[in-house]
Amino acid sequence: MLPHIGYFFNRRLLIVCSIWALPALALAQQVAVKVEGDYPQLQDNAEAFIGEVEDRSANSLRRYAGTAESQVEDALRALGYYSPVIQWEIIEPSGEKEGPARLVLTVQPGEPVRVRSRKVEIEGPASEDPDFGSSLPPTPAEGDVLNHGQYSSLRQTIRNRASRLGYFDGEFTSRKLEVDPEKRVADITLIYRSGERYRLGEVSFTEGHGFEEELLEKFVRFEPGETFHADKIARLNTDLSNSGYFSGVDVDASPGSAEDGVIPVSVGLTTRPPRSVAAGVGFSTDVGPRLRGNWREHWINPMGHSRGVETELSAPRQNLSTWYELPLDPPMTDSIRLSAGYQREEIEDVESELLTFGQQWKHQLDNGWQQVASLRWEGERFRIGADETEQSALLLPGLGYSKLQADSPLDPSRGYRIQFDVTGSHRAALSSVDIAHLNFLVKGLYTLAGNHRFLTRFQFGGVATNRFSDVPPSLRFFAGGDQSVRGYGYETLSPRDDKDVAVGGRFLMIGSAEYQYQFADNWRVAAFVDEGNAIDDLADPLATGAGLGIRWISPVGPLRLDIAKGLDPEFGGEWRVHFSMGPEL
């Protein structure tokens, strides 16, 4: 009878074979394994299986040699080599050489066992479920060298997928790995009978949370009777956790509580403290030191309304704003926010005081785009250069779309941001000037080979009006600074009047390309070129800046330090240091 080895293969051996791709573990000096030929996986597995051996005499090593030989055999079998030739010898120090005796095992792997046949079948309702059968691990495939770790992974993937999709009564009706070492072949048979797929039942919330059931039900994205999927439960947990209402969320959808294949969903909620206060100090070369603070009441009634106050203080800019927000359906993405704010700003030769009142309706489209419809009133008092102080009053309806795709919120390796906003006013609707205002921004980030990052940025803006001199500074365009064109002062790029005062432009055009190289954990160097300007005519010249920088990836996001040279002295280009922080996208 040919020897066979079943699915119950040594558990320890299967665990070790799963680490074949890890760097080799350092061994004690008293035992060494030498696998002849180019077999780094076998070498690593054998060394890992033996582990550390130390403080042994030569005689002790001789007694241990048989055990070590068996361990190496098991390690090689895990990767499909069942017929190795292993020789060992004891090397003792001689003459003036000092040190302990060493056991050296020399291994000739021999020919491997290959997979002769692979039979993987899903029976029952899961056989018609595309989510179940798709993308099962292709290895070990017919003709491959047998790898017990891959076989174990295939088996576990089927189990995990059944649990994730709700086939909780599933079982293997046949689970065999038959190996014939003499013929050097292996046959794999995995037949899984899924049973019926469970469904989700009603969602209930434990008492004492303080919110209306109608609000909480809006967080549930599935209907009773839908098929079970673990992702639906995880999404409910995440949405409730991110709502800002709760400090603890526990979603229980255990199949043990099911009746007739329907699982009731129970949600336990721990309400967070209703109010929080935060303050912080920051710095950028655009505005210098700044102080930020906010007070927020995360919920003020059972309907989940919230409100807050925010302020930012720096030498050139001071602002104070307050807001009141009402959640819509779904509350994770949709809301109405009422706001009011005051801002005072003095930059270069422009002074302004801005008072705003408005509302925003945020709505996420099915394709992932965020839509913001707004209506705000702005009253601005401003002075440009030595001109007299002027005032404007504008009622500005607006519409904006944005989308952010990134693989990490703080330090993504790839992704993009697209943002488009349009707003306007008309003298027939409580406004002092006719305006159509457009702003478009796109950023892209791509990482190649782990260490090479490429960032691009393009921004375009435009304002159409019957009388540009009546357009307030907050709706004109200025360029230059940390987040604009480096190598030039903050908002110094702009058309100028006959007194050389920057008055702001009708158009904004900015492009940037940056390369980063990661040379150490959390550290990158950068090289960049920026080009752009605030202009009155699209044919007007642009300013160019270039430079080098360094990036430190802090726990709160990247910190950027750049040294840039403005290449156009007629626009005020010079050597400048720029410091800023925040996500790349």
Q: Where are the regions that the model predicts?
A:
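Gram-negative/organellar outer-membrane beta-barrel architecture
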Residues: 125-131, 229-419, 446, 454, ...
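Cleavable N-terminal signal peptides
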Residues: 15-16, 26, 240
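Periplasmic polypeptide-binding modules associated with outer-membrane biogenesis and secretion
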Residues: 29-40, 51-285, 294, 308-326, ...
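One-face residue pattern on beta-strands with alternating periodicity enriched for small/polar residues
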Residues: 290-292, 372, 396-400, 421, ...
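Transmembrane beta-barrel strand/turn architecture of Gram-negative outer membrane proteins
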Residues: 340, 359, 417-426, 433-466
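Bacterial N-terminal signal peptides that target proteins for export
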Residues: 2-17
